[in-house]
Amino acid sequence: MGTLQEYDYLWFFLVIASIVPILAFTISEILAPIRSGPEKLTSYESGIEPKGQAWIQFHIRYYMFALVFVVFDVETVFLYPWAISFHSLGISAFIEALLFILILMVGLVYAWRKGALEWS
């Protein structure tokens, strides 16, 4: 089997992965009815009639907390496999994980000093 033939599966996957979303959006545009009106501009409250304005502004602090949460949630996802196979990885993996945690701690201290974690 030649080297180029090994990449045939990759090219096939990339072509299919490109065609499927385009096809899904195209079929949706063709088949979906286009209805506009005041009901389209209201928020959906699980079948309950919404009260008040549908368009409100959220305070930027919510986004800052969400951003910090996402960063440390992703950190957990990356560190879990490392912790599971800690004994078999060796010292280089330990140093890399330590460097990763150190970089994230620098980011946490930066966010803390900028006041991103204060709610006042």
UniProtKB/Swiss-Prot annotation:
Subunit organization: NDH is composed of at least 16 different subunits, 5 of which are encoded in the nucleus.
EC number: 7.1.1.-
Protein keywords: Chloroplast, Membrane, NAD, NADP, Plastid, Plastoquinone, Quinone, Thylakoid, Translocase, Transmembrane, Transmembrane helix, Transport
GO biological process annotation, one example: photosynthesis, light reaction
Source organism of the structure: Chara vulgaris
Stated family: Belongs to the complex I subunit 3 family.
Catalytic activity: a plastoquinone + NADH + (n+1) H(+)(in) = a plastoquinol + NAD(+) + n H(+)(out); a plastoquinone + NADPH + (n+1) H(+)(in) = a plastoquinol + NADP(+) + n H(+)(out)
Protein name per Swiss-Prot or TrEMBL: NAD(P)H-quinone oxidoreductase subunit 3, chloroplastic
Gene giving rise to this polypeptide: ndhC
Keyword Heme among record annotations: no
UniProt-annotated location(s): Plastid, Chloroplast thylakoid membrane
